[in-house]
């Protein structure tokens, strides 16, 4: 976590012991990439200031005029699915699913005075007892350096491979 006068940045990445997202039968069905090296910046004030969908008042009812795309979580590295159906856990609508890293167990941060750094290495596990997603074998290394009100974010060894369609690209999502 890196704080400034009117904003705060949080960085997250799962390990073999810490999961990144919980997917349940009736909630968070598309929450697969909630912590895949995310770098989220939250600003003071309304949630819209931080990129969340805007809510409008229409005849005393509140409705959202936008939506959240779970494929492009802020700062995350993801495989961009072209179908919402493909993004849901395969053949399973009742079990909980937690997203872990398969073998790497490195994600952490250090702070010194008003400076800080975050680093993570990730390799995706697409199963939990049984295969839940079409394997993408997503891997990446990330680091973020925070100083003087700036965030410097670096990524390397970013790759994905699997038997999914060619229009599904792998990308690190900006804001």
What does each of the following model-derived ranges do?
Residues 1-175:
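Catalytic and substrate-binding regions of extracellular carbohydrate-active enzymes
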């Amino acid at each position: 976590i890196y704080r400034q006068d009117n904003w705060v940045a949080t960085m997250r990445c799962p390990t073999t012991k810490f999961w990144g997202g919980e997917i349940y039968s009736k909630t968070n069905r598309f929450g697969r990439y909630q912590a895949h090296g995310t770098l989220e910046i939250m600003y003071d004030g309304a949630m819209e200031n931080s990129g969340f969908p805007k809510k409008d008042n229409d005849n005393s009812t509140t409705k959202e005029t936008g939506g959240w795309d779970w494929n492009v979580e802020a700062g995350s590295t993801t495989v961009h699915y072209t179908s919402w159906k493909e993004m849901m856990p395969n053949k399973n609508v009742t079990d909980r699913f937690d997203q872990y890293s398969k073998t790497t167990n490195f994600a952490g941060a250090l702070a010194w005075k008003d400076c800080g750094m975050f680093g993570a290495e990730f390799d995706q596990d697409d199963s939990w007892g049984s295969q839940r997603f079409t394997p993408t074998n997503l891997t990446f290394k990330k680091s973020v350096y925070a100083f003087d009100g700036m965030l410097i974010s670096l990524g390397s060894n970013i790759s994905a491979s699997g038997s999914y369609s060619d229009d599904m690209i792998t990308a690190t999502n900006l804001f």
